[in-house]
Regions:
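Active-site flanking residues adjacent to catalytic metal/cofactor-binding acidic residues
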Residues: 12-14, 63, 148-149
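Hydrophobic residues in well-ordered beta-strands that form the structural core
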Residues: 20, 61-63, 166
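Conserved Lys-Pro-Asp/Glu-containing loop-to-beta segment of HAD-superfamily phosphomonoesterases
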Residues: 113-154
Length: 205
């Protein structure tokens, strides 16, 4: 009997990692895409994802989307937007093998779905979504990555026993300390774009 092939998975956060956040031109408020027309791929995103796929990584996505719990928009809107992103990436030659979206929020909000207003094990910084993807794809945790743009993405990687990759630009001052520590939160690789981050990951071997 031959050895079972081990899968290395690269799990991506969505907003701020693959696609840009949405900014209200009048108020300056920042939110996330809740309609396919709002999806804007970030520079280097497709290039970085392709590089990892060509190196043998299976690609997946794990995203916190608490808006249905908070009454901001519907669960269907989240699903449609995620589906549209997966289709868009497919047209760019990037296949996404699994998607997990946590729609819970501990407090919820006015008009939100009360069934989603609760503490859960899937919302990052917990590792539940990553655990689900690893189990579904039969991945080797020691060879797999969580790639995101926030402290919670690094924490989720640690919780699930994965390596952590961080995307951040120099103007994201709240993330700069992560380059050096604190202990346990320093990412294993980082870059200003997904393309740069993918290069750093592949150079590690």
């Amino acid at each position: 009997v031959g050895e079972r092939e081990v899968t290395s998975v690269a799990i991506f956060d969505r907003d701020g990692t693959i696609v840009d956040v949405v900014r209200d031109e009048e108020t300056g408020a920042v939110t996330v895409a809740f309609h396919p027309d709002q999806l804007r791929l970030l520079p280097g995103a497709v290039e970085g994802m392709r590089s990892l796929a060509e190196a043998g990584y299976v690609l997946a996505m794990a995203t916190n989307q608490p808006a249905p719990a908070k009454g901001q928009f519907s669960a269907d809107a989240v699903r449609r937007t995620n589906d549209a992103l997966v289709e868009r990436l497919s047209r760019e030659g990037v296949a996404i093998a699994a998607v997990e979206a946590c729609m819970h929020h501990p407090q919820g909000g006015p008009g939100g779905d009360p069934s989603l207003a609760r503490a859960c094990e899937c919302r990052k910084p917990k590792g539940g979504m990553l655990d689900a993807i690893v189990a579904r794809l039969g991945a080797d945790r020691s060879r797999s990555w969580m790639l995101g743009d926030s402290v919670s993405d690094v924490q989720a990687a640690r919780a699930a026993g994965l390596r952590a990759g961080l995307v951040f630009a120099d103007n994201r001052c709240e993330l700069c300390p992560l380059r050096a520590g604190p202990v346990g939160l320093a990412p294993d690789a980082h870059g200003a774009t997904l393309a740069e981050l993918a290069g750093a990951i592949l150079r590690r071997g």
